[in-house]
Amino acid sequence: MSFGYAAEKFASARSVLMLPHPQGEDQSIATAFSECRKGLERFDRTLFDDSSSIWIKQLDQLMKTEGIEDPDREGLFLIKARQLSIDDQLQFSTVVDELQCWFSRRKD
């Protein structure tokens, strides 16, 4: 997995978090969750330094869907997005931005 691919996915996540939210803020957050997951799914986590490891732990916690039920098949990320507090949303946005910058600096 390349730094470039991860940087691209996190740039996409950051972009969908920006206004406007044509399908609603919750859907934008759920889409950003998905982009982050794609960016990290095959990335070797041993490559993270101390700072980025902290951001990854925060991201993992914010995106955690264990214990969430989805009886209407809306999608676990959408349900999780609805559960985020304003502080969680701010933290998520900040972490996505920091990681996108971190990946971008290393892609070359």
Protein language model features and the residues they cover:
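Short terminal alpha-helical segments
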Residues: 1-34, 93-100
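Non-transmembrane, amphipathic alpha-helical segments
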Residues: 2, 17-21, 25, 44-51, ...
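Generic signature of intrinsically disordered, low-complexity segments enriched in small/polar residues
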Residues: 6-8, 13, 36, 46, ...
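Amphipathic alpha-helical binding modules
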Residues: 71-108
